[in-house]
């Protein structure tokens, strides 16, 4: 009697065969001709691949979302990357594809990889060369075809998401023998004239031959030499060109590039509101810590009232000083005018005229008396005899001498009186001039003192005002700088935590090959199982050969 293994269910046997195939053929590359191609509305592609002797069924799940630019057809020569598995309901093995390359594209892919490695070694893809995009660009340059749907998508997104912008379109050919030269010349011209704050290099989807102009070295070098940040938006999300690695930012689609380059208006408003709330909160916190000092300065720094009160007090002080100066000047001016009018009056002239008239009256009186006496003498002479003539002459001479002495004495008195009056007038004039000079000097000293006091008072108030204003401005600037530094720190932290930037630092993410969920624990892995690893610039399929549990090692 022979012993035999226990019977197995069909499902169990099929699962065993499936596990064996998937563990040993987790990544295969098959070349052949497509047959029985069927693209379902769900986006899945079912096909057969054959050569002259064999036939293999296959499936490409979510094919339409990855390769919607070109639809495969029967008879196409292709190269398929995927894994072998078993379709249990029919009990047939098949290939589940995750990449499809048309025949003839293989040489281009090899050239793509060789050029990529060489340019990366020369530093054209270095992360430290990447430029930061402006937050709110005023001018946006777009290098693309002017007649395609790409430019319409970009304009539609910008008009919906931005308040105001200026867009410059540089028309180029995006496919063909001259496309690479036109694209590089467009980048150079935009930089030479400094026409934009940011550039979008855009093209719609296509095959690798259609997109090959963006893999040329001349375009990569033009992007590397650009001083204007460049966003690469070539093809679809699954399409990669060398321009994507050389550009400062890669966008999966042209519409996404427009969204990246210009935040939406609502987002900008929300960001500004959040910044405003943040600044208000920290301003209140800072001001509350200095409430005692502010209370001491409250009477001086009570918002605008302090400055108005200070200006009003300063104006009153200026007005008071000006009135005082005007009053003193008016008083001294009146006294000066009185002295001037008195000096310019005809008092002295009238006194001279009066003395002259008095002198004329005296002379006329003596002349009249002398004439009368002479007249009388002539009459006496006629009446006198000769013997009395000698006696009369002697007597007349005596009268003449007496009259002359009296006249001389009176003239002396008048002359002395006139001299005395002139001396008094001279002394009075000198004294008046001295008092006027002294008053003028006193007025000048008072004016200088008032001017100096006024200037010192004004300077003191101005210094207090400027000092208080500078203190407030310094406090506000200090507060704004602190908040700006905190904003930059948070922005850098946010950039560092961005998953795309994490990929750029050398990290990767593992996904289950079938279920498409992230693997975060070594316990979820099995030997000989296939996993997909996502890197910065693409994906790869790996086979698990060994598992080490860190917790087991620590224990």
Curated annotation (Swiss-Prot):
Q: For this protein, what is the EC number?
A: 3.1.11.6
**Which molecular function GO terms apply here?**
exodeoxyribonuclease VII activity; nucleic acid binding
UniProt-annotated location(s): Cytoplasm
User: Which CDD domains did the record assign?
Assistant: ExoVII_LU_OBF
| Entry keyword set | Cytoplasm, Exonuclease, Hydrolase, Nuclease
Record GO biological process? DNA catabolic process
Q: What class of enzyme is it?
A: hydrolase
Q: Which Pfam family is one of those matched by this entry?
A: tRNA_anti_2
Source domain of life is: Bacteria
Q: Which InterPro entries match?
A: Exonuc_VII_L (IPR003753), Exonuc_VII_lsu_C (IPR020579), OB-fold_nuc-bd_dom (IPR025824)
Q: Which HAMAP family match?
A: Exonuc_7_L
Subunit field text: Heterooligomer composed of large and small subunits.
Report the family membership. Belongs to the XseA family.
Name-wise, this protein is: Exodeoxyribonuclease 7 large subunit
* Species of origin: Chlamydia felis (strain Fe/C-56) (Chlamydophila felis)
Q: What is the lineage of its organism?
A: Bacteria, Pseudomonadati, Chlamydiota, Chlamydiia, Chlamydiales
Q: Which gene encodes it?
A: xseA
């Amino acid at each position: 009697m022979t012993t035999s293994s226990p019977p197995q269910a069909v499902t169990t046997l099929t699962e065993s065969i499936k596990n064996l195939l998937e563990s040993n053929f987790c990544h295969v590359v098959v070349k052949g001709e497509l047959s029985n191609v069927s693209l379902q509305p769900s986006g899945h592609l079912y096909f057969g691949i054959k050569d002259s002797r064999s036939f293999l069924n296959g499936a490409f799940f979510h094919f339409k979302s990855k390769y919607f630019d070109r639809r495969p057809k029967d008879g196409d020569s292709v190269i398929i990357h995927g894994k072998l598995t078993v379709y249990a309901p029919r009990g047939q093995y098949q290939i589940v594809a995750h990449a499809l390359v048309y025949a003839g594209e293989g040489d281009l892919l090899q050239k793509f990889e060789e050029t990529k490695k060489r340019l990366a070694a020369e530093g054209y893809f270095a992360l430290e060369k990447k430029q930061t995009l402006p937050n709110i660009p005023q001018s946006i340059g777009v290098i693309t075809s002017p007649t395609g749907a790409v430019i319409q998508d970009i304009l539609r997104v910008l008009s919906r998401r931005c308040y105001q912008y200026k867009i410059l379109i540089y028309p180029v050919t995006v496919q063909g023998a001259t496309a690479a030269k036109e694209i590089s010349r467009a980048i150079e011209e935009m930089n030479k004239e400094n026409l934009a704050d940011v550039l979008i290099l855009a093209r719609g989807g296509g095959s690798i031959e259609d997109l090959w102009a963006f893999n040329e070295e001349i375009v990569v070098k033009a992007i590397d030499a650009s001083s204007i940040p460049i966003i690469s938006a070539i093809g679809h999300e699954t399409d990669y060109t060398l321009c994507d690695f050389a550009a400062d930012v890669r966008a999966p689609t042209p519409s996404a590039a427009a969204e990246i380059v210009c935040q939406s208006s609502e987002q900008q408003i929300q960001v500004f509101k959040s910044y405003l709330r943040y600044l208000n909160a920290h301003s209140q916190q800072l001001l509350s810590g200095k409430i005692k000092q502010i209370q001491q300065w409250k009477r001086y720094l009570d918002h605008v009232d302090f400055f108005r009160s200070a200006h009003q007090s300063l104006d009153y002080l200026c007005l008071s000083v000006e009135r005082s100066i005007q009053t003193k000047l008016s008083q001294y001016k009146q006294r000066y005018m009185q002295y001037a009018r008195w000096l310019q009056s005809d008092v002295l002239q009238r006194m001279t005229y009066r003395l002259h008239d008095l002198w004329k009256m005296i002379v006329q009186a003596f002349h009249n008396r002398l004439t009368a006496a002479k007249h009388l003498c002539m009459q006496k002479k006629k009446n006198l005899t000769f013997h009395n003539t000698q006696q009369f002459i002697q007597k007349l001479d005596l009268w003449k001498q007496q009259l002359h002495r009296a006249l001389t004495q009176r003239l002396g008195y008048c002359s002395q009186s006139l001299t005395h009056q002139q001396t008094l007038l001279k002394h009075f004039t000198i004294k008046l001039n001295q008092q006027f000079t002294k008053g003028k000097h006193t007025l000048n000293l008072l004016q200088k003192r008032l001017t100096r006091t006024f200037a010192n008072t004004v300077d003191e108030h101005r210094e207090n005002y400027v000092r208080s204003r500078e203190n407030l401005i310094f406090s506000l600037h200090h507060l704004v700088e602190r908040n700006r530094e905190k904003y930059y720190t948070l922005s850098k932290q946010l950039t560092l935590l961005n998953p795309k930037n994490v990929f750029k630092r050398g990290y990767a993410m593992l996904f289950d090959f079938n279920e498409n969920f992230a693997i975060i624990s070594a316990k979820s892995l099995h030997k000989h199982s296939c996993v997909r690893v996502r890197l910065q610039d693409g994906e790869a399929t790996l086979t698990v050969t060994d598992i080490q549990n860190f917790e087991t090692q620590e224990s």
